[in-house]
Amino acid sequence: MNIKGRIFIARHGETVFNFAKRMQGDKLDTPLTRTGFAQADAMGAALADWLKPGETLQLWCSPSGRALQTLAVIAEHIGHDWHQTTHEPRLYEINVGDWAGRTYAEIMDDLGPIMDETHGLFSIRPPKGEWYDDIAQRLTDWLEETAHISEDRLVIMHGMSSRVLRGLLLGLPVTEPWKAPIAPSLPQGTMVVVENGQEQIVRQGGGGHLA
């Protein structure tokens, strides 16, 4: 995919639901924990060190409160105006349908295993929810609509959806049964930059909640 400029990508910091191992998806939202704010703070400091003096970024964010909270901390570090952020619904997390608000343990008590532990991805589709090809389609639409942008971008989003975005930007193959290009999982608190189909780590997170 021919994308101009660099795209810095991070998921939000740890939330109350992340800590409780409870599904959030695209609709439910909970605030960051102290760990989540610390992760955002560390990513912001790392990005400030990465950028050269005078370099600016376009700010793009999922409309979820947890993503916007994370971006507010990062934007302060790099001296950017959070109010100038573009809120982009296509950056939302995967829609987990009927699983939203339930713990992983509760769901597995009803259905058995729902995760492919090797890849850190769902092994079955959430009832009334999305699958990974749905995420890939909405993110492809966003990338194509914004392909004219030459400025560097900072994109704050979510665990599952960020893996699909990275997969698209890196030109990874579509994998079954997920029907989408999906990049490897990274610890929460990690930020990467993708340029010309190559990925570098800006800040390596040390948190859990791999996605």
Specify the residue positions occupied by each region the protein language model found:
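Conserved histidine-centered catalytic loops in small-molecule metabolism enzymes
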Residues: 52-80, 84-90, 112-114, 193-211
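Generic beta-sheet signal
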Residues: 7, 57, 149-159
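Phosphate-handling substructures
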Residues: 17, 77-138, 203
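Short beta-strand scaffold positions
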Residues: 61-62, 137, 156-157
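Short active-site segment of divalent metal-dependent hydrolases/proteases
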Residues: 15, 161-162
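Active-site-proximal alpha-helix that buttresses catalytic centers in soluble enzyme cores
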Residues: 5, 11-80, 130
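Acidic, low-complexity terminal tails and accessory targeting/binding regions
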Residues: 1-6, 49, 80, 94-106, ...
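Active-site signature of alpha/beta-hydrolase-fold catalytic machinery across serine-
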Residues: 73, 164-168
